[in-house]
Every structure is written in structure tokens, then in C-alpha cells.
Amino acid sequence: MKKICLFIFSLFIFIPFVSALEGDVNVTNENPNCTTKDCYKTNKEQEDDLITDLKSAILIEEDSGKILYEKNAHDRYAPASMTKIMSMILIMEEIEKGKLKWSDTLVASENAASMGGSQIFLKANEKMSVKDLFKAVAIGSANDATVVFAEKIGGTEKRFVDKMNEKVKSLGLKDTNFKNATGLDEANHYSSAYDMAFIARELIKHEKIFDFTTIYEDYLRQNTDNKFWLVNTNKLIKTYEGADGLKTGYTKEAGYCLTATAKRNRMRLIGSIMGA
């Protein structure tokens, strides 16, 4: 994960001021005491040094959607918990339509409580507010909380996933097929760095999302004997000025992946990498 954060950090700093200048090729001498041609690297060569261990990557500007950098951006890979970016879109839409309220209480099913991976250890029939469940998803990447929402909105997780795929099509994206709401490894569950960046672009149209994705740590079940500490899986929000989201991911199949957002000087960038 440190390597991923370093790469995104490098993209946010390096790309906007250099690589966004389409057609320009600058040459940098990294060692002023060296005078042979091997001492000099073009921007492209410097970028390639950063991405040796990454399968795919993309950086876009939010407002225009302009691609500032890409590597194998349309290649399909398991997206792990970045899947939850789409899940959160559907949740936010339900809230904005008034079909869900932050103060509503939802009940965990046995199925939701049985989820593995990242979780807040919900028990079957446990009740929790929409706001706290959403914190669990956005901050802690909780699979059990995600399935609670999926079952509430879709009736079943499968029907919720159908809605996720319908949303993908409505956005005109062609590299994504979801099989579950959480991102746990499953056959035929895939996306691309390109699609994840533009799915993220859709999510952050709901500006309320930043009230959650910028939280580094919080607690659930306060004033109980089962207090649960949430720590944001996205360390960039603590270490990189302007970082305000968005979603990390890791599974054995996917490797490490991250879709990150950051804003400085009225410009927000969205970076997505897969397969680190």
C-alpha cells in the first residue's frame, strides 16, 4: 500500500505540471554531474519508472474528464473494494431521493453478518443507523455494512448488483461487470482503471460523500461494550494535502488498488491504479 500511495502522490505532483502538456517532451538530467546521454530521461521515461509494478493506471481532471496520464487504462482486472464506489453511488442516490434518511435504522440479515474480509462484525438482527453504516463502508470498507445497504435497496444483493451494472451502462462504460456489491473475488467480476476513475467522478458529484471520505478515524457503537474503532484505509487523506478520497482495495486476485481524489487551487484530480 505504501507503493500505491507513493505512485498516486507522484501522479498528483508530477503529471499536472508536466505530462498534461500534450505533445511536449521535456528531458531531465537527474544527476547534474553526469554528461552522457544515459543520464537524461524524458518525462515518459520518468513516468515509466514509477509504474513498473502496476498493471494499469489513469489520472483525470474532474471537471473536464480530460485524461492526463494512462497506462493500460482499459485492461480489465478485479477491482476489489473499489467496487464499493459504485455501491456508494446507489446509496447516495437513495438518500437524495428521500428513500433513505441518515437517521433511519437498518437491520443486518444473517447473510450480511456472514460476510468475510473487511467488516465491522455486525451480528444478525443488529440495528444500526444509515449514517453509521455508511461510515463503515466509506471509512472502513466494511463488507457486512455494504450488504445491509444492498439488501435494503435491492431487496437482495443480486438485484442491487443488477442496479450497479445498469448504472455502469448508463455512464457509457464498457470495461466493468459487477457480480457482488463488496468487491470480494468472484468469477467475471472486473473493471478497469479507466472505468473506476469515471465511476469515482460520478460518485463525487454527491458532495456529501466528502463528509465521510475525509474522516481518518471514528467510532461506531459508542457508549456500548462493543465500541468499534474505524480507521480510514486511505492513508493519503492524512499524508497528502488536498486528498479527500476515495477508496482502496485489496484481494489476493486484485492485489493492491486505489482510486484517489485530491483538490488544490480549485482543481480536483482523480487517480486510479490497479494490480500493484
What is the predicted role of each segment?
Residues I15-P16, K97, T224:
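Residues in and immediately flanking transmembrane alpha helices
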Residues L21-Y194, F198-E207:
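Active-site-adjacent loops and short helices of periplasmic peptidoglycan-processing enzymes
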Residues I8-L11, N29, L230:
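Low-complexity, intrinsically disordered regions enriched in charged/polar residues
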